[in-house]
């Protein structure tokens, strides 16, 4: 069932690299748990910092974190004081030296994680879910996305019975492995309960060799061919008849 497949996991090792990059002989569960705790702490600590995802690289004595964010100034702070404070906090948690790199996301409207977070914040502020979803879709298409799908599930609008609503525009291929699909899901905690928000953004097709090393932001994208217009309306059929009549 293609619609049930996680687009990120399906493309790992093909066109998508890993967010955790390290090697361990026998301590893998503990390190994996520490990675999860680091990501949860950073998401809570930088809730207003526009944090999309965290790439973790490890050496025996050092941890390198790359924070992909749309608001680097909020994370770095004036004169770098905020990022130094964050580094000291993470050092106490991990008992290792921590190096933090901040990478700016130029187009947050095309980042699935940031789009989902934005919709979740609007739902928590009691904005209409339809308005939030349609605004996000129009912004992504305007910024160059080939297709986008957004799904919200829960007690939408305070309804007694939970339901699922989704909006889609453009192409969102689920089984094309060369399709660059950015996927994320988040949760909006409203007064009526939790609402799940899932976002799929199709950015284009990647052709050729792909560099799967960490922190590679630029990817080679193949522009998809424009769809050919097929069929036609009443006016099109009438114009074809007129052309045939003139030729006769």
Explain the meaning of each model-derived region:
Residues 1-248:
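RNA-contacting regions in translation and RNA-metabolism proteins
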